[in-house]
Every structure is written in C-alpha cells, then in structure tokens.
UniProtKB/Swiss-Prot annotation:
<feature type="transmembrane region" description="Helical">
    <location>
        <begin position="1"/>
        <end position="21"/>
    </location>
</feature>
<comment type="similarity">
    <text>Belongs to the YwcE family.</text>
</comment>
<feature type="transmembrane region" description="Helical">
    <location>
        <begin position="55"/>
        <end position="75"/>
    </location>
</feature>
<dbReference type="Pfam" id="PF17368">
    <property type="entry name" value="YwcE"/>
</dbReference>
<dbReference type="GO" id="GO:0043594">
    <property type="term" value="C:outer endospore membrane"/>
</dbReference>
<keyword id="KW-0812">Transmembrane</keyword>
<keyword id="KW-1133">Transmembrane helix</keyword>
<keyword id="KW-0472">Membrane</keyword>
<keyword id="KW-0309">Germination</keyword>
<feature type="transmembrane region" description="Helical">
    <location>
        <begin position="25"/>
        <end position="45"/>
    </location>
</feature>
<dbReference type="InterPro" id="IPR020185">
    <property type="entry name" value="Spore_morphogenesis_YwcE"/>
</dbReference>
<keyword id="KW-1003">Cell membrane</keyword>
<protein>
    <recommendedName>
        <fullName>Spore morphogenesis and germination protein YwcE</fullName>
    </recommendedName>
</protein>
<comment type="function">
    <text>Required for proper spore morphogenesis. Important for spore germination.</text>
</comment>
<dbReference type="GO" id="GO:0005886">
    <property type="term" value="C:plasma membrane"/>
</dbReference>
C-alpha cells in the first residue's frame, strides 16, 4: 500500500505539470485522481469492500494508462513529427 500512496502523491501533482503542455490531458487526469483519493480514504478507514478494492485497482491502472498516453502526446508525438519532417 505504500507504493500506491507514493504513486497517489505523484499522480496528484501530474495535472500541474501537464497543464502547460496539454490542458485536455491534464483535465482528463483529474477525475481518476479524485476517485483514487476517495477510495484511499475508504481503505484507510477499513470500510472498503472487495468490490471497492477492485475499483481502486482499476482506477490506479486507468491513471497509469492516462499518464503514459500523456507522456506519449507531450514527448513522443513531437519527436516523431520532428523525425518525419526531415
């Protein structure tokens, strides 16, 4: 759970870093982050059901996918476009 909490802290700051490069991706990453904090609160109060655990892991995976898509959009596409224009 420590790794999840560490990722949650890093993920919470991600929209701030993405805002200058791509506002749509930054805004799309906010709802999963909010939901992950809600599920984390339920986990810490021991009131999270097995379904809640599954949803929390699904949100974690969704946020990882969004982060990778954002990294590709921000860093990968410009690099590919630069190499294609040569």
């Amino acid at each position: 759970m420590d790794m999840f909490f560490a990722y949650l802290l890093i993920a919470s700051a991600t929209p701030l870093f993405l805002w200058l490069d791509n506002k749509k991706v930054a805004i799309s990453s906010i709802p999963p982050i909010i939901l992950m904090w809600v599920f984390f609160f339920f986990y810490m109060t021991s009131s999270l059901s097995p379904t809640g655990h599954s949803l929390m892991i699904a949100l974690f995976i969704l946020n990882v996918v969004i982060a990778h898509v954002a990294a590709f959009i921000i860093y990968g596409l410009p690099l590919i476009r630069k190499h294609m224009s040569r």
